[in-house]
Amino acid sequence: MPKLKTKSSVKKRFSVTATGKIKSTQSAKRHGMTKRSKRSIRVQRGTAIMNSSDSRIVKLFMPYSR
């Protein structure tokens, strides 16, 4: 059986924790940050854990990181 390929776009955007959760950077922080509060800008710096319904889809594209 041939090896399965990992999607390059998913490989660059997401990482898997030791417990199997999918971790990514926060979205919606490219432009228009002047009208947001300082707290929301500060929160956007960190990473986010995806919920289980979305992480199932991402795990399909990363076959060897389970």
Swiss-Prot record:
Pfam family, one: Ribosomal_L35p
Gene Ontology, cellular component aspect: cytosolic large ribosomal subunit
UniProt keywords, alphabetically: Ribonucleoprotein, Ribosomal protein
Highest taxon of source: Bacteria
GO MF, one example: structural constituent of ribosome
Alphabetical list of InterPro entries matching this protein: Ribosomal_bL35, Ribosomal_bL35-like, Ribosomal_bL35_CS, Ribosomal_bL35_sf
Source species: Ehrlichia chaffeensis (strain ATCC CRL-10679 / Arkansas)
One biological process term in Gene Ontology: translation
HAMAP family per record: Ribosomal_bL35
Protein family membership: Belongs to the bacterial ribosomal protein bL35 family.
Sequence ranges of Basic residues compositional bias: 28-40
Keyword Ribosomal protein: yes
Region (Disordered): 20-40
Name of protein: Large ribosomal subunit protein bL35
